[in-house]
A protein has these predicted regions:
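Short, well-structured N-terminal submotif of metal-dependent ribonuclease cores
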Residues: 1-37, 49-57
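A general structural signal for well-ordered alpha-helical segments in protein cores
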Residues: 21, 38, 42, 56-59, ...
């Protein structure tokens, strides 16, 4: 089974029902994959839900089918080594995926692979 890390922007696209939300939902419906998010993504979506007064029911429903991966000291050190003044969050997400045995990352960010310096497969929605 393929383990896929979902970048925060994919879940935000769904929660806010933005233009790519249907494509994101379709991509996340493959039963042959295990979907996961980083602890950082959980923080980001929870913060955005509070800020924009979104329903927490939707988040809780999402969390019931997603693994939540830890950000450890090893994750932070790996991300720090790769950071080149572009996007530390991308580096942290990629390092989290790599240290937790994910095979791919699903994102909306066209520059994710370039900024994160990951060797994992990166699937860009849209």
């Amino acid at each position: 089974m393929t383990r896929s890390l979902i970048d925060a922007n994919v879940l935000l696209e769904i929660l806010f029902a933005r233009k790519l939300s249907d494509g994101c939902e379709q991509l996340l419906s493959d039963p042959s994959k295990e979907y996961a998010i980083s602890a950082l993504t959980l923080h980001i979506i929870w913060y955005m839900a509070e800020r924009y007064k979104l329903s927490f029911e939707n988040i809780i429903d999402m969390l019931s089918v997603l693994a939540i991966l830890p950000i450890t000291e090893q994750t932070i050190r790996l991300a720090s080594q790769r950071y080149d003044n572009k996007d530390f969050e991308d580096c942290l997400q990629a390092a989290c995926a790599e240290t937790n045995n994910c095979q791919e990352i699903i994102t909306i960010d066209k520059h994710f692979k370039q900024y994160s310096h990951t060797k994992l497969a990166v699937i860009v929605v849209g």
